């Protein structure tokens, strides 16, 4: 199913994506998901060099077929469209852990040639970040941190993020 086929899909409060030509419908992201994505994106934007930009929910079309909406993206600054693979896509795990959904999307990012893929678990007690790097067409895990342990990577640019800060505003006091 080509990405353009999503155009007639109603705005029913669900996310509709085509990571490998198969329609995946999931509930709209909840507050923990959106807060973690927004704080992550802000941290990325503060750390990224001038020639790059970090942004939320790109709704990118990744080749033929395939449309996915990563939670955060880092790409080179250019015109109004993303015509080459971004340097980084980040996905926040849904509450149901959506593993089939993430496997489809991860495979789509691999095929599209996205060099860096991050996975965020917004668990309030022990949030975590995992980084994957594209090597010979497949992702290999390169970094992992949880809780208050700093997550450090050098690609696509040096950045340090403490996973617990992604959900700090969600914790009850």
PLM features per residue range, with description:
Residues 1-173:
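Gly/Pro/Ser/Thr-rich low-complexity, intrinsically disordered segments predominantly at protein N-termini
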């Amino acid at each position: 199913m080509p990405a353009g086929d999503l155009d007639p899909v109603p705005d029913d409060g669900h996310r509709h994506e085509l990571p490998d030509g198969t329609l995946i419908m999931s509930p709209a992201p909840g507050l923990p998901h959106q807060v973690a994505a927004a704080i992550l994106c802000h941290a990325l934007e503060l750390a990224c060099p001038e020639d790059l930009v970090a942004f939320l929910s790109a709704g990118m079309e990744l080749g033929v077929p395939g449309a996915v909406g990563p939670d955060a993206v880092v790409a080179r600054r250019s015109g109004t469209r993303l015509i080459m693979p971004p340097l980084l896509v980040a996905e926040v795990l849904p509450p149901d852990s959506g593993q089939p959904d993430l496997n489809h999307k991860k495979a789509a990012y691999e095929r599209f040639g996205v060099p860096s893929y991050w996975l965020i678990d917004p668990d309030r007690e022990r949030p975590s970040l995992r980084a994957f790097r594209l090597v010979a067409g497949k992702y290999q895990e390169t970094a992992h941190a949880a809780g208050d342990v700093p997550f450090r990577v050098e690609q696509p640019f040096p950045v340090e993020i403490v996973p617990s800060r992604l959900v700090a505003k969600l914790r009850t006091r």
